[in-house]
């Protein structure tokens, strides 16, 4: 088993035989983990506002439009991209359409993977176990895919990737052969180097943006480890009914 990290979606190659865990810790995968814990009826991800509005116009039920551009909810949206806000929201039985600047694009880029999960600090142990168990059962490799920021490296995602790699490694039995790719080793190094996780996130580009728009409480919230045992999972033809499933409108 190969465990590796891609620090941007552009690094991803030949993923049809891999289990992919997408990370956009500030804040899309954190928000989506919370959203799915609230047991909505459907969660649909899109890459553009135009696609969001198109899907909404085609549905017979009134969906909740959720997400952000430049950190804030676009005009006419019901919610933004705040995991702390979603934690207090009543989403039971609702249809949610979600779009974000970086996270949903990264997720869309890996839909051909053997299986796709969403990871963050909030569900770290749960997503690590889910990915590891699937990889062992189906003889697949594990690739953590960082969304990055504006198609570039993001230290917050890399740090979270290192944390998730460490959680997977802790699960590996002594009789399981595995190796860490260069990206996974680098992510572990980043995770081990920084001791003040909140300070790291505050100094990151995405973190500074969240602070600038007045949502610094999101950083405190999303750093809570293992708050939620929900693992968002892509709905596919081979995986039509995951417990916490989402679909992607390409």
For each predicted feature, which ranges?
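Structural motif
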Residues: 3-4, 18-21, 41-44, 62-65, ...
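Residues that scaffold, gate, or flank divalent-cation-dependent active/transport sites
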Residues: 4-11, 28-40, 50-96, 104
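Solvent-exposed alpha-helices and their adjacent loops that cap or buttress functional pockets
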Residues: 11-15, 36, 56-58, 87-91, ...
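Long, charged alpha-helical interface segments
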Residues: 78-105, 109-115, 129, 155-250
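Short, structured patches in soluble enzyme cores that scaffold and shape functional sites
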Residues: 100-102, 120-121, 144-148
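Catalytic cores of nucleophile-dependent amide-cleaving enzymes
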Residues: 120-135, 139, 149
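Phosphate/ribose-phosphate-bearing ligand recognition and processing surfaces
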Residues: 147-157
């Amino acid at each position: 088993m190969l465990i590796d990290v891609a620090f941007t979606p552009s690094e991803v190659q030949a993923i049809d035989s891999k289990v992919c865990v997408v990370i956009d810790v500030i804040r899309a995968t954190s928000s989506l983990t919370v959203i799915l814990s609230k047991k909505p009826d459907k969660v649909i991800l899109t890459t553009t506002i135009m696609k969001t509005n198109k899907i909404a116009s085609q549905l017979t039920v009134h969906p909740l439009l959720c997400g952000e551009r430049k950190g804030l909810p676009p005009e006419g949206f019901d919610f933004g991209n705040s995991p702390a806000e979603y934690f207090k929201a009543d989403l039971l039985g609702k249809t949610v359409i979600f779009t974000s600047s970086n996270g949903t694009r990264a997720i869309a880029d890996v839909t051909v993977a053997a299986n796709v999960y969403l990871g963050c600090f909030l569900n770290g142990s749960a997503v690590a176990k889910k990915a590891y168990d699937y990889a062992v059962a189906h003889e697949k490799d594990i690739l953590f895919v960082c969304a990055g920021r504006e198609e570039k490296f993001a230290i917050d995602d890399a740090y979270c990737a290192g944390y998730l790699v460490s959680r997977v490694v802790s699960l590996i039995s002594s009789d399981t052969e595995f190796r860490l790719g260069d990206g996974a080793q680098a992510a572990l190094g980043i995770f081990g180097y920084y001791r003040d996780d909140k300070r790291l996130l505050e100094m990151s580009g995405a973190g500074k943006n969240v602070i600038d728009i007045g949502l610094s409480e999101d950083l405190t919230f999303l750093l809570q480890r293992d708050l939620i045992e929900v693992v968002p999972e892509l709905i596919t033809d081979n995986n039509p009914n995951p417990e916490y499933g989402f679909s992607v409108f390409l």
